[in-house]
Amino acid sequence: MDIEKLTLKVQQTINDSQKIAVKYNHQQLEPFHLFAALVFQEDGLIPNILGKMNINIKVLRDEIKRELNEMPKVLGDGAQNSGVYATRSFEEIFIRAESIAKDFKDSYISVEHIMLSLMQGRSTSIKKILDKFNIRKDKFLNVLQQVRGNQRVDTQDPEGTYEALVKYGRNLIEDAKKHKLDPVIGRDEEIRRIVRILSRRTKNNPVLIGDPGVGKTAIIEGLAERIVRGDVPEGLKNKIIFSLDMGALIAGAKFRGEFEERLKAVLKEVENSQGKIILFIDEIHNIVGAGKTEGSMDAGNLIKPMLARGELNCIGATTFDEYRKYIEKDKALERRFQPVIIDEPTVEDTISIIRGLKERFEIHHGIRIHDSAIVAAAKLSQRYITDRYLPDKAIDLIDEAGAMIRTEIDSLPTELDSIKRKIFQMEIEKEALAKEKDSRSKERLEDLEKELSNLKEKDKEMTAKYEKEKEQIINMRNLKQKLDEVKGQLEKAEREYDLNKVAELKYGIIPGIKSQIEEKEILIKENSQGNMLKEEVTENEISKIISHWTGIPVTKLIEGEKDKLLRLEDELKSRVIGQDEAVEAVSNAVLRARAGMKDPQKPIGSFIFLGPTGVGKTELAKTLCKNLFDSEENIIRIDMSEYMEKYSVSRLIGAPPGYVGYEEGGQLTEAVRRKPYSVILFDEIEKAHDDVFNIFLQILDDGRLTDNKGKTVDFKNCIIIMTSNIGSSYLLENKKEDGIDETVKNKVSNALKDRFKPEFLNRLDDIIMFKPLTNREITKIIDIFLQDIENRLKDRNITLIVTENAKELMAKEGYDAIYGARPLKRYIENILETKIAKQIIKGDIYEGCKIGVDIKGEEIIIGKI
């Protein structure tokens, strides 16, 4: 027996048969061990053929194990050391298999030859099992012919090439017949263009090119459904579309040439079908370089000749980037395909597409989807999710909203869950009190038992209601699933022209199920008041999902949030003292945005704050962020003093290709991509280079910016605040108490025009001037600083009391009109905080005491009260 003449699977079978003999303590290697190894082979050819002969493989394997246990065993120390010896009948199997292989005109002995040789052998154990399971040679040969086709065994791994399309592909026509594909709405023009290209004599290979998520694969599924319905030209009727799985084709190809062998087997099957099979390769760019190792060919070069001759009908699908990167590079491959551009559908088209899918989602999740939710999904996804494409992002929203409602149905309602937890806690308390003997414990036990019985009654009532509601929803889901299955049967009956079945389904079963669904829906609507479970996806759920994804508040305003927004101006004024004009402008911009009245193509607001240092420009941005997001973390702060050189623009949007830092992205673009709803603070903008302002033009006008990788970043949900000290010397001259003098305003405006270009200033929503602080405002600021100190001391249970005289001295000593409120803060830190800290460390001030702050002469003194 020449081992080189055996296929890899046969060599594996011999090894497996030896392992079986050792496992069962058999000293002789019999044909039965070989038979067992063939049947036990996972994903092997023999189990596949036997399965097609309608033989229960599990039962067959159990029978073989029983037979192996009954064979003579050799036990003891001697048996351990001695090997396993092949019998004469075992060797005869291979002699017979060699002659069978010659009859088949095969170059190698394969597993099917071994199986046929075993069938012809004299082993009584094998014959007994074959007879018991009715495994006959003629039947085996018929199924083998179906699996092998006209292929010959001329390689060492032929089993991997049998039924190659079934193994490495998916029959879309079969899926369409079984009602497994989602309905495809619209896209008629694209499908017609594909049909025209497929009907050509040569170069009949369309490649669908479009952005990810626009529905390229869905269009091919739509074509498969049309072929099933017969809604195609005569030339495409009865064609089969096979979707090739490149991953499965490459996976497990260990040796050089194995991948090419598999692909050749697939192509041979397509060629032998004489144009009946159309091959669909999703992500077709993967064929360029797929399976390529040193010295071997890639998949692209293997299919080129067949594409050129028109022997292979192939449809590809890829994105613009991948087409340019892989297919366009290979000009010979590119010219063999005809591009079909798939554009992103409009919002209206997306609504139609989702309406077509609505029923499938309702059946899967067992819920109902409102039409308003479908419209909201299309419109809101287009507006707020800018880095993905329709209809994919809108379908994802509907799917996730359905999943959210479904999980809420499956889990206990909050009210019922809290009652069950309370009962559990009371049961524990009851057990503890039962062990106590004092009168108070006995009284508490009596009260507890009454409360517990009331809660248990309530729990019983609510659980019954919950179970009833859940049962109604599950029944509705089952009815909808049944209706979907019956519709699939109707389509099949119409294709097969079974008129009796069509009449029975169309006029008997389907109307009956529909009337049951209507009855259930009426019942659910009637009892909807006070329902514990929600089984509808509405606009609100879609808004919630978008808010989770992006962080942008899209949900309808609830009462608490309305009050918070209406109070926003007062909240800002309480922290930013004396700058009412700036506070009003910013809070009004936020109100417009949340009410949906802002221009959807521009940022929420873009402002430039002008004024001397320390008057509250940066503080306003921080306070706004704290009020909107409950933290200052969502502020994106860019210090423009770091962008004084011309080349530093690249730090904002990312370095160009070939430069260090290209992969990292820009500081501004990456920050906004991660947090699309945020406050962006460009501090000290006059310090930046002139060229930096050129990138602001797109942000301020269209609310977008393209980064170094060509991706668009959306600024439409950002508040842009820029601060500058330009004209601060003029503002310090302002003598007007309740505002800014007109002459001062004109001087500041002229200074601004001298520094910035008109196209930049013209795009800003508002230029706000901050006036110097008055004495009254300084006192209020001191109160804010002291409140911060009080809050810190409160943690230690220490009370701080400051006299008015002390506050006046702080204002006099700490405030400087040129430097603003910052020196005042430093003064309070140095004089007040430092003195308190020293006394805490000494132990003079301790937890629970009161501190008084007063003056003595021109000095602030601190002491215990």
Swiss-Prot record:
One of its GO terms (molecular function) is ATP hydrolysis activity. Residues 86-150 are annotated as: Repeat 2. The lineage of its organism: Bacteria, Bacillati, Bacillota, Clostridia, Eubacteriales. The keyword Protease does not apply. Part of a stress-induced multi-chaperone system, it is involved in the recovery of the cell from heat-induced damage, in cooperation with DnaK, DnaJ and GrpE. Acts before DnaK, in the processing of protein aggregates. Protein binding stimulates the ATPase activity; ATP hydrolysis unfolds the denatured protein aggregates, which probably helps expose new hydrophobic binding sites on the surface of ClpB-bound aggregates, contributing to the solubilization and refolding of denatured protein aggregates by DnaK. The keyword Transmembrane helix does not apply. This is Chaperone protein ClpB. It comes from Clostridium tetani (strain Massachusetts / E88). InterPro entries: AAA+_ATPase (IPR003593), ATPase_AAA_core (IPR003959), Chaperonin_ClpB (IPR017730), Clp_ATPase_C (IPR019489), Clp_N_dom_sf (IPR036628), Clp_R_dom (IPR004176), ClpA/B (IPR001270), ClpA/B_CS1 (IPR018368).
